[in-house]
Amino acid sequence: DKAKRWLFNYPEESCVLLQRIADECAKFLVAQICAGAQIIQVFDSWAGELSPADFRTFALPYLSSIAEQVRDHLASMSIESPPMIVYAKGALGHSIHEIIKSGYNVIGLDHTIEPMVARAAVKKARDGKTKMSQVAGTKGSGHPIALQGNLDPAVLYAKPEVIQERVRRMFKTSTGGFGGQGALVCNLGHGITPG
């Protein structure tokens, strides 16, 4: 609540601070890549705590800035950018089209969005109905953006047969799953819950 109060009471100052944080995150990610990281992921685990308008004001521009700065800095050193993943927990339901345009190669899905909904949004972007970042994806790929995640981490506490069924369901079109369409990293929809 304190952070949101700050955002609402000091929006300009918040944006300045968020840009500084994005700048430092980008520098840190570039250092990781220069040290050998072959893929990077940017997490915004609190994105769903913001309304759609607030997400587009106080989160999305800075997620985009990180991706752009990382690529620009690497290009200035003649280093190819590795794949970049963005994970904005809870924001996909209202902002997936904007997240697709944010400059990342992979969109991390939480367990609250059906994979086929996300895949349809990626397909719409690929087909030119949505302006998409020129840096995302690779030439010649079936889909310019891959998807990752979606399995509810709490399922790991279930019996093995339940876990197996949930993983199978991730791939079935009839249950909203990926349906064998496009690039997918099978993964959890968030971190492993302690306990």
Short names for language-model regions:
Residues D1-G195:
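Active-site loop segments of alpha/beta catalytic cores
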